[in-house]
Amino acid sequence: MKKLLVVLAFAPVLASAQVPSSPSLGIAEGRCRAGEPGSAFLINVVGLKDRGGTMKAELYPANDNDFLADDNILINAGKTFRRVVIDVPSSGNVQLCIRAPSAGTYGLSLLHDRDGNRKFGLSIDGVGFGSNPQSLGPFKPKIAVGRVTAGAGVTPVNVRMLYRRGLMSFGPIK
């Protein structure tokens, strides 16, 4: 009975500690700032299908359980999650800078949200990962396709975008 009372007493505190869901989760932590020291990735996006919509980069812990996991769950567990979103420029190179907590290995994913609805559209949108896989099947990718290693400063990485090809596979545009 005492344990139940203790749990009930702390329930409001525990509930208030949860981070509410929002598209802005991880953005403040992920944004690069001019002259700021620390680890970051400068992502050069290649192989875009078109210049519409937005480009979203997300950084995850480097393990299969946390890679592409729900941002709320990661943040509430105190795990790495960073996000950067930009409008795709009408011309020129498409680059995003995303900060990492420190030098080390992470999982990196990109979404070309061509219709700008902030959701992945299987038949419309493109995806990219840090290790540049040649193709993707219909299943959730493992960390091996997204693994990148940050140095102490800014680490450049090229990411090739993949778009739906055929019924359930993704590959680069031709």
Residue map of PLM features:
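Sec-dependent N-terminal signal peptides
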Residues: 4-13
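Acidic, glycine-anchored loop motifs typical of Ca2+
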Residues: 113-122
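Tryptophan-paired
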Residues: 71-100
